[in-house]
């Protein structure tokens, strides 16, 4: 049932919505409060992020369908968003997601060395997870908007800037 603001009080008996945890639905509802009720579509990005977080870092068709139902959208509208943005994963990935910026500023400051170092240290290539499921080295990021602090990477949505190979080792070694 929707409130006047467009947020949901419960799942309203919608079968797919029950796939979303109570916490995920509450997170989506907080975002829905920021938009007019007729613009629920505006909450699709944070809704997908919440669903992905609920599922250990990746989205399933079932979760995307539940998000579509919760936001009263056609499933294809949600699939298009999830498959377009690099922040969403559609297959299982490692617990810690590593994104190295590979745009011009970072590349000129050694991002290619950082990527090679991470690949060698973890024994994986870009787009792969470690066999123990601990790390996932995302496809190259085009730009993470921290050009003045290049090279940089993002690990689990936290920025690490002015990287050296030693600093990369410290960061990765600190993650369980």
Briefly describe each language-model feature range:
Residues 2-176:
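Signature of N-terminal electron-transfer/Fe-S-associated modules in redox systems
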């Amino acid at each position: 049932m929707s409130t006047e603001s467009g947020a949901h009080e419960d799942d309203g008996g919608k079968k797919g919505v029950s796939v979303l945890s109570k916490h995920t639905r509450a997170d989506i509802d907080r975002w829905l409060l920021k938009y007019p009720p007729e613009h629920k579509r505006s909450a699709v990005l944070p809704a997908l992020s919440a669903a992905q977080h609920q599922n250990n870092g990746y989205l399933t068709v079932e979760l995307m369908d539940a998000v579509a139902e919760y936001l009263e959208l056609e499933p294809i509208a949600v699939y298009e968003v999830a498959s377009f943005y690099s922040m969403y994963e559609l297959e299982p990935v490692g617990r810690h997601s590593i994104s190295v910026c590979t745009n011009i500023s970072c590349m000129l400051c050694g991002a290619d060395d950082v990527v090679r170092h991470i690949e060698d240290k973890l024994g994986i290539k870009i787009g792969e997870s470690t066999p123990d499921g601990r790390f996932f080295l995302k496809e190259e990021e085009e730009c993470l908007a921290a050009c003045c602090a290049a090279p940089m990477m993002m690990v689990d949505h936290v920025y690490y800037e002015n990287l050296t190979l030693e600093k990369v080792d410290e960061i990765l070694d600190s993650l369980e």
